[in-house]
């Protein structure tokens, strides 16, 4: 179990929908500090969160997840002045725009990776940090393909690949930072939007999706926090239909373990 009591949490996402509902649940867990980094101001949401737990300090910064890493460093230098340290980093920024592949990939994958690369040194035990947990909020179509939202699905597959790679013991044994992902199923805030398919052949399906049964943002947010509390390094969870399910990970390339062992053995030989 991962105890959130007293933790300093940094949430990178728009403070609405799933992110807002997740933050509401976090505020009931006696966290000490919550930093929210999002693209637009939402003072009503911040006030709503603060009313749940007045003793928890909430900080807000406008943040563009697609900015260059050099700019991110400036932001997080400022964030650390207020936060002192980060125990939990949650990446929740998302975009589904099949007409704008670059923006979709930059928001969902590249921006998330740059954010993680920027924050990791602050959390790394060998660099003066205390370790902690990185949570990548992603989608079930990062596990199974979507013939309708091809660009979105590709970006979410990338999130899963990045999560599993960064969670490898090669890193975790040294930096003490666990990495996990939560894959959300169809959720009301997503399907309420006007959705465009990657190719016109899939548009009728995209239109019908808006009428499909979906989980609420509040239930999804609750299960994201449940997954965090139950998390172990490298785990992938599915939050869908009001439930929470642990993904059984599978290795398709059977030489993967041997290859990593070979690289580690060569490193040890070089040190000798």
Swiss-Prot record:
Claim: Oxidoreductase is one of the keywords in the record: yes
The entry's keywords: Oxidoreductase
Superkingdom assignment: Eukaryota
Any one GO cellular component localisation term in the record: cytoplasm
Entries under Gene3D superfamilies matching the protein: NAD(P)-binding Rossmann-like Domain (3.40.50.720)
InterPro entries documented for this protein: ADH-rel (IPR002427), NAD(P)-bd_dom_sf (IPR036291), Sc_DH/Rdtase_CS (IPR020904), SDR_fam (IPR002347)
Protein name per the record: Alcohol dehydrogenase-related 31 kDa protein
């Amino acid at each position: 179990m991962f105890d959130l009591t007293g933790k300093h949490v940094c949430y990178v996402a728009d403070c609405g929908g799933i992110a807002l509902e997740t933050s509401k649940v976090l505020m009931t867990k006696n966290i000490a500090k919550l930093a929210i980094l999002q693209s637009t101001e939402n003072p009503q949401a911040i006030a709503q969160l603060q009313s749940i737990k007045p003793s928890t300090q909430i900080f807000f910064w406008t943040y563009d997840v697609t900015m260059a890493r050099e700019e991110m460093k400036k932001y997080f230098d400022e964030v650390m002045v207020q936060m002192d340290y980060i125990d939990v980093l949650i990446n929740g920024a998302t975009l589904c725009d099949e007409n704008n592949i670059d923006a979709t990939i930059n928001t969902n994958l590249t921006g998330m990776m740059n954010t993680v690369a920027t924050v990791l040194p602050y959390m790394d035990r060998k660099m003066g940090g205390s370790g902690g947990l990185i949570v990548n909020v992603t989608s079930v179509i990062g596990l199974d393909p979507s013939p309708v939202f091809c660009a979105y699905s590709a970006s979410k597959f990338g999130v899963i690949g990045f999560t599993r790679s960064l969670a490898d013991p090669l890193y975790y044994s040294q930096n003490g930072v666990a990495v996990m992902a939560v894959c959300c199923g169809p959720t009301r805030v997503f399907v309420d939007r006007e959705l465009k398919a990657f190719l016109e052949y899939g548009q009728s399906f995209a239109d019908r999706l808006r009428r499909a049964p979906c989980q609420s943002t509040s239930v999804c947010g609750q299960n994201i926090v449940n997954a965090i509390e139950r998390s172990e390094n490298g785990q992938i969870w599915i939050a869908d239909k009001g439930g929470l399910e642990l993904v059984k990970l599978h290795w398709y390339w059977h030489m993967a373990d041997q290859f990593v062992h070979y690289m580690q053995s060569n490193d040890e030989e070089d040190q000798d």
